[in-house]
Regions:
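Short, well-structured N-terminal submotif of metal-dependent ribonuclease cores
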Residues: 1-37, 51-65, 69, 107, ...
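Generic beta-structure capping elements
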Residues: 14, 40, 77-80
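Alpha-helix capping/helix-boundary segments
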Residues: 9, 41, 81, 100, ...
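Phosphate/NTP-binding elements of NTP-utilizing enzymes
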Residues: 45
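Active-site regions of enzymes building and remodeling cell-envelope glycoconjugates
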Residues: 122-128
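Active-site neighborhoods of divalent-metal-dependent phosphate/nucleic-acid chemistry enzymes
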Residues: 55-61, 68-114, 128
Length: 128
């Protein structure tokens, strides 16, 4: 399965893996799954770190390098992804989350999230 991790799950996987459920850790560690992170997550981290958000105080350069070194593939943002945001219902206003949902849908990936609002979207989303 192709798994796209949302921003918080990426931060937890890299910095505080105990915050992940056992089933989420199992999915991340399974050789049957391909792991992806979105450029949107890197962008979100950079922006929110610059705003001094305490839950985003991580060096995005190091996080990206660590993800790549640990087998994650980087998912760029395409115009197809941006246009897919327009088709989403107005469930949630966070532009980063909406872009992640659009990317997962457009790419046929399963989006893993801990956010109950994100999990309300139709499509390949799994709340963990």
């Amino acid at each position: 399965m192709r798994l796209l991790l949302d921003t918080h799950l990426l931060l937890w996987a890299a910095g505080t893996p105990k915050r992940l459920s056992a089933s989420t850790r199992k999915a991340i560690e399974s050789p049957d799954n391909s792991l992806f992170f979105s450029v949107a997550s890197v962008w979100e981290i950079v922006i929110k770190r610059s705003l001094d958000r305490p839950d985003f105080q991580v060096d995005a350069h190091l996080l990206r390098r660590g993800l790549l070194d640990n087998g994650y593939a980087e998912l760029p943002i395409t115009s197809e992804h941006a246009l897919a945001v327009e088709t989403l219902p107005p469930i949630h206003k966070d532009p980063f989350d909406r872009l992640l949902v659009a990317q997962a849908t457009a790419e046929g990936m399963t989006l893993l999230t801990a956010d109950a609002n994100v999990a309300l979207y139709p499509g390949p989303i799994r709340k963990v």
